[in-house]
Amino acid sequence: MKKYKIIMTGGGSAGHVTPNLALVPKLKELGFEIKYIGSKNGIEKEIITKENIPYYSISSGKLRRYFDIKNFTDPFKVLKGVMDASRILSKEKPDVIFSKGGFVTVPVVIAASMKKIPVVSHESDLTPGLANKIASPFCDTLCVTFPESLKYIKDNKGKLTGTPIREDLLKGDKERGRKFCNFKENKKVLMIIGGSLGSKIINESVRKILNEILKEYNVIHLCGKGNLDESLKNLEGYRQYEYISEELPDLMALADLVISRAGANTIFELLALRKLNILIPLSANASRGDQVLNANSFEKSGYSMVIKEEELNSELLLKSIKDLEKNREKYLNSMKMSKIGNGVNNIIDIIKKSAHM
């Protein structure tokens, strides 16, 4: 019986890596041998090696939308990356490549195309990121998460699959989460997720109105690295953490309402878990504007309340929390009606087909 092999790639941020992990259990169940290609120093190396998946490093230049002197040297790093990836692919002879985006994927996808190895890519955001835009001509299929994304994909390569969500995230234990936080009072739980680096403006806005919030809620605040406030360490009902990984499913199960950035992976997890949410997307000035588009789509569908970062202040945040609670059933019903589910099975079907399984 033929042993099938897949090489996965994606990196630069956790959002380009964790969706890969959501596919791993199913791929293993199907008998796929899994290898990974990432950068030498990216976050993907730490995440993937913890999962005991064989990891290859390649050279990769950063893709920028702005002028930088490195724009003249990085194409040579990409070229070296293509040669690095080509050697790995010649050695491993995979049946299919799965690419999750991030600049490290571009050399891998180009090398795979040159060797006629099928490439399945996935884009979480509403509009394709720069890496997926560049890699798109070399892909066979580009899986997307939002129905609106299909209009941006050329040559009929786009497939609406949804985003892959880790099974363990959907199986959190509320009581285990409560025990972990050790809340004394049995109130509703408000959770704030500012991303792995945190958000200064969200952290400050929340902390200014903590006393008001704590009248109604226990608070779990994922504030990002280096953003703990020591003066609030012993405040009853308030738990702050720089970052949570292992316990996240339990804390998500415990949360009644979530305030979050609008990265695609996070918001689709909130939708899958049917969590009331307020989204504060990273402004277009500080990014390519993908979070603004993601949030607008969710607001239009009735899944989320949205506050623009430029308009955020403590008073507006407190008012929005109260308004969301008043309209709780309306938002929950919209989420229940959503036909967008976990994308794992849809993507696995495309991978199997591409590998001629």
Curated annotation (Swiss-Prot):
Tell me the organism's taxonomic lineage. Answer: Bacteria, Bacillati, Bacillota, Clostridia, Eubacteriales
Q: Which CDD domains match?
A: GT28_MurG
Q: What is its EC number?
A: 2.4.1.227
Catalytic activity line of the entry: di-trans,octa-cis-undecaprenyl diphospho-N-acetyl-alpha-D-muramoyl-L-alanyl-D-glutamyl-meso-2,6-diaminopimeloyl-D-alanyl-D-alanine + UDP-N-acetyl-alpha-D-glucosamine = di-trans,octa-cis-undecaprenyl diphospho-[N-acetyl-alpha-D-glucosaminyl-(1->4)]-N-acetyl-alpha-D-muramoyl-L-alanyl-D-glutamyl-meso-2,6-diaminopimeloyl-D-alanyl-D-alanine + UDP + H(+)
Q: Where in the cell is it found?
A: Cell membrane
Q: List the disulfide bonds.
A: none
| Protein name in UniProt | UDP-N-acetylglucosamine--N-acetylmuramyl-(pentapeptide) pyrophosphoryl-undecaprenol N-acetylglucosamine transferase
Describe the task this protein carries out: Cell wall formation. Catalyzes the transfer of a GlcNAc subunit on undecaprenyl-pyrophosphoryl-MurNAc-pentapeptide (lipid intermediate I) to form undecaprenyl-pyrophosphoryl-MurNAc-(pentapeptide)GlcNAc (lipid intermediate II).
SUPFAM superfamilies linked:
UDP-Glycosyltransferase/glycogen phosphorylase
BP terms from Gene Ontology: carbohydrate metabolic process; cell division; cell wall organization; lipid glycosylation; peptidoglycan biosynthetic process; regulation of cell shape
Identify its membrane topology class.
Peripheral membrane protein
Species in which this protein is naturally found:
Clostridium perfringens (strain SM101 / Type A)
EC supergroup of this enzyme:
transferase
GO MF annotations in UniProt:
UDP-N-acetyl-D-glucosamine:N-acetylmuramoyl-L-alanyl-D-glutamyl-meso-2,6-diaminopimelyl-D-alanyl-D-alanine-diphosphoundecaprenol 4-beta-N-acetylglucosaminlytransferase activity; undecaprenyldiphospho-muramoylpentapeptide beta-N-acetylglucosaminyltransferase activity
Keyword annotations from UniProtKB, A to Z: Cell cycle, Cell division, Cell membrane, Cell shape, Cell wall biogenesis/degradation, Glycosyltransferase, Membrane, Peptidoglycan synthesis, Transferase
- Its GO CC terms? plasma membrane
Q: Which family does this protein fall into? A: Belongs to the glycosyltransferase 28 family. MurG subfamily.
Q: Where UDP-N-acetyl-alpha-D-glucosamine is bound, by residue?
A: 13-15, 166, 196, 291
Pathway field? Cell wall biogenesis; peptidoglycan biosynthesis
